[in-house]
């Protein structure tokens, strides 16, 4: 069994209204030093198998197909046994 | 002619679309459950709502429903497909239309009437409207901020694929009239072939005066006229 972690983020330059709202709220709490907030998704998958290389390839495929929308998002995949 | 309204778990405008087509226009209309992949209709409606709870992203999971395989085949064969709100999001996720939806710029869920300008009336969905006609149609969405790459936008404009743009009551396309931050004030686009339309506003909610307006009728009337002319079916 392996653990795959997929991080999905909006591509740089794509507007992130959720991040903006959080930034404004942090400023309202007095954390003026925060200059930018971007919100993404962190998805953990428990995957059957031992071949970490193969698992990584499969999970990248999953991210490309479903977990991220590559028109607006980019993703990174980390796998550990 | 026969209309099919697809029902995903979480669709909530399916009954409204069914009602308008069946009772207001008196056309044969059936529901298509998302697990069905064998049906025979002349126009497919992907209704609004929150398919699969909009978990992950709006439309992302619905796009892999069994029914969508058939919808893609139907669309590729030239069949008429109209996606409204969540249906539009599903069409984008399925790659039947280019681009993607971001959250509304204001982050608010916007639920009110907007004005749209008909940019192209040379489509099966708008032939009964005149170019530049202003329609008053309600929206109800949190993720209707249309986005695409600059090259894609250029192509959409050059090909006349931008069918509806948000405008004010006088038909002027302004930033103030844009309810969600959509690129180029886009409210609805069509595919290159012209048989697949996605739009965020809800024409099914304004097809009877008792609901406050009839501006949505022109879209259904256009589709019916197109099908009556015996145009190709998928």
Swiss-Prot record, chain B:
Q: How does it assemble?
A: Part of the FGAM synthase complex composed of 1 PurL, 1 PurQ and 2 PurS subunits.
HAMAP family in alphabetical order: PurQ
Stored Pfam families = GATase_5
Q: What residues does the Glutamine amidotransferase type-1 domain cover?
A: 3-233
Tell me the gene name. purQ
> Which keywords, in A-to-Z order, does the entry hold?
ATP-binding, Cytoplasm, Glutamine amidotransferase, Hydrolase, Ligase, Nucleotide-binding, Purine biosynthesis
Q: Mind listing the GO molecular function terms for this protein? A: ATP binding; glutaminase activity; phosphoribosylformylglycinamidine synthase activity
Matching SUPFAM superfamilies: Class I glutamine amidotransferase-like
Question: What is the annotated role of this protein in its UniProt record?
Answer: Part of the phosphoribosylformylglycinamidine synthase complex involved in the purines biosynthetic pathway. Catalyzes the ATP-dependent conversion of formylglycinamide ribonucleotide (FGAR) and glutamine to yield formylglycinamidine ribonucleotide (FGAM) and glutamate. The FGAM synthase complex is composed of three subunits. PurQ produces an ammonia molecule by converting glutamine to glutamate. PurL transfers the ammonia molecule to FGAR to form FGAM in an ATP-dependent manner.
Is Transcription a UniProt keyword of this protein?
no
Q: Which organism is it from?
A: Carboxydothermus hydrogenoformans (strain ATCC BAA-161 / DSM 6008 / Z-2901)
Which Gene Ontology cellular-component terms appear in the entry? cytoplasm
Q: Which residues form the active site?
A: 85 (nucleophile), 202, 204
Q: Which GO terms describe its biological process?
A: 'de novo' IMP biosynthetic process
Annotated compartments: Cytoplasm
Q: What is this protein called?
A: Phosphoribosylformylglycinamidine synthase subunit PurQ
Recorded metabolic or biological pathway in which this protein acts = Purine metabolism; IMP biosynthesis via de novo pathway; 5-amino-1-(5-phospho-D-ribosyl)imidazole from N(2)-formyl-N(1)-(5-phospho-D-ribosyl)glycinamide: step 1/2
What this protein catalyses is: N(2)-formyl-N(1)-(5-phospho-beta-D-ribosyl)glycinamide + L-glutamine + ATP + H2O = 2-formamido-N(1)-(5-O-phospho-beta-D-ribosyl)acetamidine + L-glutamate + ADP + phosphate + H(+); L-glutamine + H2O = L-glutamate + NH4(+)
- Which E.C. number(s) belong to this protein? 6.3.5.3, 3.5.1.2
